[in-house]
Structure formats: C-alpha cells, structure tokens
Amino acid sequence: MKRHEAREKALQALFQIDVGHIPPDEAIGNVTGSGEVDPFLRQLVFDVIEHRAEIDELLRSNLEKWKLERVANVDRVILRMATYEMKYVDDVPVSVSLDEAVELAKKFGDWKSGSFVNGVLSKVKAALQK
C-alpha cells in the first residue's frame, strides 16, 4: 500500500474512532477489510491517538477565531494526522505532510477545507520550526 492510500485509510479509521467512538483495531478492520494491515496505516492511527493531547494543544494554539471542537470532524482528523506527521515522523518531509493533508481535505472535506487545512498547518509548521 502506498503512503497516500495509507493516509486515506487512516483518515477514515480515525474519523470512525473520533465520531463513532469505536476501538482502533475495529476501525482499521472496517477500512481495510480482511488481510494484512499496512504498518504506516497502523502507525498513523495508533500514534495520532497516543499523541492526541499534544497534537490538539499545538492545533489550538494555531487556530485563529476557531475552537478545535468546532472544526469540521473530517478537517480536525486531517489536521491531527498531518500535525502528528510534521512533529513526530522524521522520514516524511514536512512539506509532503502538508501537501498530502491539503489533498485529503480537498477530497474528503467541503469546498473550503483545502485552504483551511493549508492555513492552519502552515502556522503549525512555522511553530514547529521555532
């Protein structure tokens, strides 16, 4: 599985976990069906959950005129995934994480999601580079 596809599946699984409050393994199973689970997909899902408090704090400090809880569910999950990658995944360039997040937002969010995600993550990127 390519990383782009793993990100899409991780987004779908994390969305189910966030909105449906289901266990991570069940959510991963729902999006992958039976068979082997991609290690990057598993890493994204479990590590975003593990680091959620730090990720959310970083997002809150970079949202202007928004509360994280009011951000659309899909956008919030995308922001969490990308922030996790930008902060914790050394083998993925920050620009790739940001670009992938914008593409996911365009595909799964509404018509404003791409620019919203880009704006927030650009601020997160700047904050991480300090």
From Swiss-Prot:
The domain of life is Bacteria
The entry's family comment says: Belongs to the NusB family.
| A molecular function GO annotation | RNA binding
Q: Which SUPFAM superfamilies match?
A: NusB-like
- Gene of this entry: nusB
Which keywords annotate this record? RNA-binding, Transcription, Transcription antitermination, Transcription regulation
Which Pfam family is an annotated match for this chain, by its short name? NusB
Decide whether keyword Ligase is in the record.
no
What role does it play? Involved in transcription antitermination. Required for transcription of ribosomal RNA (rRNA) genes. Binds specifically to the boxA antiterminator sequence of the ribosomal RNA (rrn) operons.
The protein's matches in CDD domains, at most eight in alphabetical order, are given as: Terminator_NusB
Against InterPro entries, the record matches this protein to:
NusB-like_sf, NusB_fam, NusB_RsmB_TIM44
Q: Which NCBIfam families match?
A: nusB (TIGR01951)
**Gene3D superfamilies for the chain:** NusB-like
Listed under GO biological process in this entry are: DNA-templated transcription termination; transcription antitermination
Species the sequence originates in: Geobacillus thermodenitrificans (strain NG80-2)
**GO CC list:** cytosol
**What name appears for this protein in its UniProt entry?**
Transcription antitermination protein NusB
